[in-house]
Amino acid sequence: SANKVDGLSYTLSSRVHNEKVVKRTESYIYYTEEGKLKKSNVYKLDAPYNVHIDTTHAQIANVEVVVEPKDNHSFYFKIENRGGSLYNFSKDSIIRNADLNLPKVARYNQWIEGKDYKLMVTKTQIPYSESKFSFRLVQLKEATGRATQNFSVTNASKIASIISVSKNAESLNEAVDLLNNSVQVLIENELSER
């Protein structure tokens, strides 16, 4: 029915629902690729590494960090502008301005911890190229806003139980991953309410 489609549309585009999707997909980490001619946003599935943060630990947000490979087991962190915001992830709030002071060299698959950060970098199957890849942590509300952009739910046919969900994003992998996880979160929520 139209009410069911309206209800699903509201749920799928709500901040609460999309915040769950963002947390599940770790979409609060933005990645960029900088080549010789341009700098572009890329999704984690298109990056040569993924960053995982400990969401129970204070983190410094809004600092761009370049990760360059050193060898198969370690990498370099390079930061041009250390000034960011100390961020409480669980409360989605900024505590104060702070500088990010990461070690110059770190190892893949190991927690890297300091007073204002706790993160891990894992290698993916995507090889490093001549491009520079960087990441930055953003606040949940910014990541949730990006997840809800260009998202639509419509009645796909006259059959009331079929809906069409679409999402445009920076990359196809981002759109597919966010859509799949959005539907999965919806299914889990529907099942838990029964």
Regions found by a protein language model. Name each.
Residues 176-177:
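Solvent-exposed, non-transmembrane alpha-helical starts
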Residues 156-173:
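Structural beta->alpha junctions
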